[in-house]
Amino acid sequence: NILDKKMMANRQSNSYQRMMEHYDDLLTGRKWWSRIYMRFIWNEDTNLLARKVLDLIPDDFRGRLLDVPVGTAIFTAEKYRRMKDAEIVGLDYSEEMIAIAALRKETEEIANLSLEQGDVGELPYANEIFDCVLSMNGFQAFPEKEKAFAEIFRVLKPGGCFCGCFYVKGERRLADLFVKKVMERKGFFHPPYDTFAEAESRLRSMYGDDVLTEKMASVCLFRCVKPQRESTENEQ
């Protein structure tokens, strides 16, 4: 029985390894077909985009960081190994993604990363507990985007940083068509989506003037700082 359990665990590990490699090939453009997909459909370099997003967080960051959705941690693993003074929580709704990320955490020895399955629309955390929230290519997949934005704002400390990127409509007709005909039908994307202008307006309405945005093909890259609470007369 012990041998059977070990064999089953090995098969499961090998299965997740194959899934991780295929998924990562698609995202990173390691294969010719994935490079065609990223260039022809999206007209973007996901590796460059990921580097630009992660550069918004310093390697010497100290504090608690929430990564939602963590995905397979393909783009963040190397960064997190350098962030030795950070306490990082990776959350994803998909148990498969969590399993793949756990395999990467183990094989690449990312000691400061903990992984949890959960819903961004109902984050299982107290108010104002994170110093930074990272969300890379997540919002197009969130069914309840308003709740996701509100929950991230709730768990972020005043003065904390919210950064990442997500798909915006109206920038590239081929990408918009692919989203509607393929990604939505497969359940990978969930409407509605903001235009770039709408995304910028939304972020400014929540975070005020301390908002930076950049358009990269059909993606909005952003960095926001949550305003400090205004002190009351009793606190002064």
Task: Name each region found by the language model.
Residues R64-E122:
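Class I SAM-dependent methyltransferase SAM/SAH-binding core
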Residues L3-D59, I74-E78, K180:
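Conserved class I S-adenosyl-L-methionine
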